[in-house]
Amino acid sequence: MYDKWNLPRRRDKIVQRRAVTAVLAAAALLLTAGCSSDDGGSPGGDGSASSSRTNGQTSPPERSGEQTPPAKGSVKVLRTVATGLKTPWGLAALPDGDLLVSSRDEATITRVDGKTGKKTELGEVPGVSPAGEGGLLGIALSPEYASDHMIYAYFTSASDNRIVRMIYDEKKPSGEQLGAPDTVLRGIPKGVIHNGGRIAFGPDKMLYAGTGESGDTGLSQDKESLGGKILRITPEGEPAPGNPFPDSPVYSYGHRNVQGLAWDSKQRLFASEFGQNTWDELNAIKPGDNYGWPEAEGRSDEGGFHNPLEQWSTDEASPSGIAYAEGSIWMAGLRGQRLWRIPLKGTEASAEPQAFFEGKYGRLRTVLPAGENRLWLVTSNTDGRVEPKDGDDRILELEVS
């Protein structure tokens, strides 16, 4: 029996209750008027600019005893792991080296053999209602996966965005390997746009989720709403111990649409965020901080907001997933169609961001550490934004420095 979070009739408030079986959330409004789509269209610009460091103050760096990575890095494609994926979104690595990938529009989870690329469908996640940028989004393995075989998933339902967990039984036939979903958290506002969707277990074994404001900008500053936030909960869905706001899953607020979460070697959290028309952001996350949206987009001179450590024009980035490797954050760009390297010194960039693969593989959705100096990179060319090429979508294995 778990504490469930559910939306009452007023959509932008949350309340806590206990139930054996939680009821469905009240229908969320699809607010899209006057808002741009984050997934963007065709890339713009010549790709020569990297980012802007002008305007506003940055957070003080945390540098004690840390080495600075080289100003310039490198990326080498080692191999194509898999092809022919449809609207891939979330990615999780199994202990044996195989990968699980979610399909946003088909609402399925597929296992990809890490050596041969063979694909085996686990099954369809019930209750997913794909539309616009919504559908089956992020996935993550339980920190106790070796014993509980739980897969967590963030998805858009008919009434909200929510997080569920399912037992994965690989002994069952293909297509029937997912158990019935247990709802961990419900009541995250949904929309045609700005659904967030990235989930990841942190070094503290708590579950973190990046959410969007669903096109209703006022939700980002409302600490009683789950929209436009980074959330931190226990594996059972309770507000995690030590959260900055009492009895609340909210970890940070003032976000527009968070789709990337990663921790560095010092267990510091970073998040990527879609801007509206001007600046996309990479942020160093501190519990309880306000990241400014909708009052600020990118760096701001106004007090009270935590400024991004880097920002990009939206045609260069439209960032989704991020990963940490070799002293740098690696950020996948959708509209920007490039992989960004941001070398770090503490919680600041130590050199100008560096772009790779500009336009070569199209839209890039997810990047995940693959051990040592390697990454997995997932493309996103079958999501209706561009014309897919033969073999799309694909998973690449990279060697980075």
What are these regions (language model features)?
Residues Y2, R18, A22, S36-G215, ...:
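Acidic, Gly/Ser/Thr-rich repeat motifs that build Ca2+-stabilized beta-propeller blades
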Residues W5-V23:
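Bacterial N-terminal signal peptides that target proteins for export
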Residues L31-G34:
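C-terminal motif of bacterial Sec signal peptides marking the signal peptidase cleavage site
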Residues Q221-K266:
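Loop-centered beta-sheet repeat module
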Residues L231, D280-F305:
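Mobile, glycine-enriched helix-loop/loop "lid" segments at the mouths of ligand-binding/catalytic clefts
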Residues S252-F274, T278-P287:
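Acidic, glycine-rich loop-and-beta core segments that form the ion-binding/anion-interacting portion
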Residues G260, L269, T278-E281, H306-Y324:
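C-terminal amphipathic alpha-helical segment
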Residues R363-T366:
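Repeated scaffold domains used in trafficking and secretory/extracellular systems
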